[in-house]
Amino acid sequence: MELAVVGSSEFVTGFRLAGIKKIYEAKSDELESVVTKVLKDSDVGIFVIHEDDFNKLPEILRDTLSESVDPTVVTLGGTGESSNLREKIKQSVGVDLWK
């Protein structure tokens, strides 16, 4: 399983420097099609997207991403990101690791 990152060039640069191979730069108008493409990739286990980009997606796609376990979707960059990550880990593993 691989990590995939979708977002603006500024958002994905750090992930690219860290050696992540599945990097998808996407402008606002391309976001929905790129996210759909990543969701269909069976090699992706964790999908990272900026919270602002996540909020730009249609509600139906946001719901799909929020409920997705494979891949697990993690939003970064907004308020409350720690609790979001905690919930995603709890959802995918089945245990609250912070307790």
From Swiss-Prot:
Keywords: ATP synthesis, Cell membrane, Hydrogen ion transport, Ion transport, Membrane, Transport. Pfam families: ATP-synt_F (PF01990). InterPro entries: ATPase_V1-cplx_f_g_su, ATPase_V1-cplx_fsu_bac/arc, ATPase_V1_fsu_sf. It is a peripheral membrane protein. Disulfide bonds: none annotated. The keyword Membrane applies. The keyword rRNA processing does not apply. SUPFAM superfamilies: AtpF-like (SSF159468). It is found in: Cell membrane. GO terms for cellular component: plasma membrane. GO terms for molecular function: ATP binding; proton-transporting ATP synthase activity, rotational mechanism; proton-transporting ATPase activity, rotational mechanism. NCBIfam families: PRK02228.1. Component of the A-type ATP synthase that produces ATP from ADP in the presence of a proton gradient across the membrane. Has multiple subunits with at least A(3), B(3), C, D, E, F, H, I and proteolipid K(x). This is A-type ATP synthase subunit F.
